[in-house]
Design a protein with these regions (language model features):
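Regulatory N- and C-terminal appendages and interdomain linkers associated
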Residues: 59-81, 181-205
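ATP-dependent phospho-/nucleotidyl transfer catalytic cores
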Residues: 18-93
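Active-site acidic catalytic loop and adjacent metal/ATP-binding pocket
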Residues: 74-123
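Short acidic/histidine-centered micro-motifs embedded in hydrophobic/aromatic stretches
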Residues: 82, 159-160
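Conserved kinase catalytic-core helix
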Residues: 1-30, 144
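Extended alpha-helical coiled-coil "stalk/arm" regions that scaffold and mediate dimerization/assembly
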Residues: 153-155
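Active-site activation/catalytic loop segments of kinase-like enzymes and analogous catalytic loops
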Residues: 119-151, 161-182, 186
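Gram-positive cell-envelope targeting signals
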Residues: 3-6, 49-55, 65, 86, ...
Length: 205
């Protein structure tokens, strides 16, 4: 359904030189913010005399979060190199609020946030909302088969989903453990989702 929507409504739109630069700087800023956020959490945890269970889970897995952010940062630079000379960007009608609850009888509902923009936004939002509930690898494979993403679109997609969410604050230790474990699950699942595409890209070089 999503691929069909994007296929039927996509076209190339001329953009100014600053368009890609603006996207690059916005994402760079978000990555920098997350890196500082997680570095601060690590330093606080490192200085704890007696590590709480939630802090133990975080400290033990911090390297994976850091690796995900380094990957996003490195790929963002590669993405910017790809689009530097582009004068057009592919856009289409996007739902802009994709989740399973907005799919009813094989139709998309709740169109309040629709807009014309890059198709990548719909895939990112669907993944962020439903990564725990569906086999996204299969969905992404089918989507790309029906609506092949351009190299710079695919790269942008993987950059955006590889950025881990912030850890929600809680005063309950059990809840903290649960939330941190969920962030780690997100990081591991996302790495697993992206890996085959990166491997294929390396083989094609």
């Amino acid at each position: 359904i999503i691929a069909s929507l994007h296929n039927k409504t996509s076209y190339f739109k001329e953009v100014s030189e600053d368009k890609f630069k603006s996207i690059y700087e916005d994402i760079k800023s978000n990555i920098s913010y997350l890196s500082n956020y997680y570095n601060t959490l690590y330093e606080i945890g490192f200085n704890e005399v007696y590590a709480s269970p939630s802090n133990y889970i975080f400290m033990r897995n911090y390297f994976k979060i850091n690796a995900a952010l380094e990957y996003a940062n490195s790929e963002l630079d590669n993405w910017y190199s790809l689009v530097t000379n582009e004068t057009k960007i592919r856009v289409c009608l996007i739902h802009n609020n994709l989740e399973l609850n907005h799919l009813l009888n094989n139709k998309l509902i709740s169109w309040d946030n629709y807009m014309i923009d890059t198709p990548v936004i719909d895939i990112v939002k669907l993944y962020k909302n439903e990564w725990k509930n569906i086999n996204f690898s299969e969905i992404l494979e089918r989507y790309i088969y029906k609506f092949p993403l351009l190299d710079y679109e695919k790269k942008l997609l993987f950059i955006l989903i590889s950025m881990p969410p912030q850890i929600k604050k809680s005063n309950n230790e059990f809840e903290k453990c649960k939330v941190i474990s969920e962030v780690m699950d997100y990081v591991f699942k996302t790495e697993e989702l992206i890996r085959p595409y990166n491997t294929k890209q390396e083989e094609e070089k």
